[in-house]
Amino acid sequence: MAKKVQAYIKLQVSAGMANPSPPVGPALGQQGVNIMEFCKAFNAKTESVEKGLPIPVVITVIADRSFTFVTKTPPAAVLLKKAAGVKSGSGKPNKEKVGKITSAQVREIAETKAADLTGADVEAMMRSIAGTARSMGLVVED
């Protein structure tokens, strides 16, 4: 028989930097999960990723207080800011442009996000990523 799921917890945790402080500690402690066990497992799983990059994680808490977790790819906005070399997006993206990004960089980000995005093909994912870039005030160049 399948184990009974108690809760799903969705968090964004910096790669290789999970620790018991908020937001990780309170979210897991509320469900009775061993916080240090999660932190060690998460840090081990994300050691190949650039340190400090926010990684979305979905933690499945089982009724016996054990857990499993699935990591996703970093948010597209974070990858776009990193590729463009900007600190933050534009407050007025239709008027003020904050940076430029090439279509090759958009393709690279789309291929990175391919596991998480439900787009039919790379071209569709590229259009989605380009739309995100435009909404952040980035210019997509060919």
Curated annotation (Swiss-Prot):
Domain of life of the source: Bacteria
Keywords assigned by UniProt, alphabetized: Methylation, Ribonucleoprotein, Ribosomal protein, RNA-binding, rRNA-binding
GO molecular function terms listed in the Swiss-Prot or TrEMBL record: large ribosomal subunit rRNA binding; structural constituent of ribosome
GO biological process: translation
Keyword Ribosomal protein recorded: yes
Gene Ontology terms: cellular component: cytosolic large ribosomal subunit
Coiled coil: none
InterPro entries membership: Ribosomal_uL11, Ribosomal_uL11_bac-typ, Ribosomal_uL11_C, Ribosomal_uL11_C_sf, Ribosomal_uL11_CS, Ribosomal_uL11_N, Ribosomal_uL11_N_sf
Modification comment: One or more lysine residues are methylated.
Known role: Forms part of the ribosomal stalk which helps the ribosome interact with GTP-bound translation factors.
Record PANTHER family: 60S RIBOSOMAL PROTEIN L12 (PTHR11661), LARGE RIBOSOMAL SUBUNIT PROTEIN UL11M (PTHR11661:SF1)
Family membership: Belongs to the universal ribosomal protein uL11 family.
The protein's assembly and partners: Part of the ribosomal stalk of the 50S ribosomal subunit. Interacts with L10 and the large rRNA to form the base of the stalk. L10 forms an elongated spine to which L12 dimers bind in a sequential fashion forming a multimeric L10(L12)X complex.
UniProt xrefs under NCBIfam families: L11_bact
Protein name, entry field: Large ribosomal subunit protein uL11
Organism: Proteus vulgaris
Gene: rplK
